[in-house]
Amino acid sequence: MKTFLVYNTSYFGDTILTDALCRNLKRLYPESRLVFVSNKPFTDISRYMDGVDEVWTYDKWGIHKGLAGWYKFYKEHKNQYVFDAAFVIYGNERGILLSKFLGAKKIYADNRHAIVRLLLSNGKINYGKWIHVQDRHAYLAELYAGKPMESMKIRYHVPDEAFAYINEQLLKGISKPIIGLNPVTKREEKDLKPDTLLALAQKIKEAGMIPAMIGAGKDCESYYENLPPADRQVLLNLVNKTTIPQLGALLKSCAVLISADTGTAHFALALDVPVVDVFYLNDEANLAAWGPKAFYRHRLIARGGDFSAENIWKNTQDLIAENISL
């Protein structure tokens, strides 16, 4: 049985996109064991991704910060496995060194530093036709196996206890269809315009559905609190009400997610939840790598498109109609 190490200590969306690599490794080596090194805040993303057997939490802003923290992490995990191969996302140099120290027989990564590349089993990577980030992650499996990778959907398995919380507590007594609204991003200029959000909420309500605002963090709280008090009463406020697995269960309860945030959008797609992406700053050409692949149920409204509430709602209705017809 082969044992693999996948290292990605990046953020929410980056982590979930790595599942394309994990699923390809499991497709090629069904009996293998896959260990995923994850950034601490996103451990519950990697833990329930399809193909992941075990998660090691890297607390890069806490006990594993800096070189001393890196060495502590190494000592915590040395000699646990003999890794047949390690796959280091974004060519992270600490991840490459860790893989070497842990004794990985082969290491695959996209890193162009002349010295670091001496540690890798691959040369400069020619991705050929693969443009999307998730496919480029998965291509590392092809380099190791010598067999073609498949472009496939990312998947996340929501644990039963998360569904129990959503169904028995958070959404208890709610029977109307829910439309998720995720307006807040890491940059204010990318956030869904408040006027657009409120216009959408009204359209959702008029259609007999419930507009639910989701998200986490102080910025999401501030966004909601800064809405006019009378208007925000239309929204079901679910900000900071869930853990990551519970958010997964909540998204599964939504007919559609309307999202300005890429990470949450990718998460919804991993759950097979239809998504309307609203990206103000990037056009479709710029999103060729990071935007959703065609096999996901989604609509993309990018720079140069129609960002009116009417158009966003039309795209939402189209997705709902397509889902009903399936």
What is the predicted function of each stretch?
Residues 1-326:
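Catalytic machinery of carbohydrate-active enzymes
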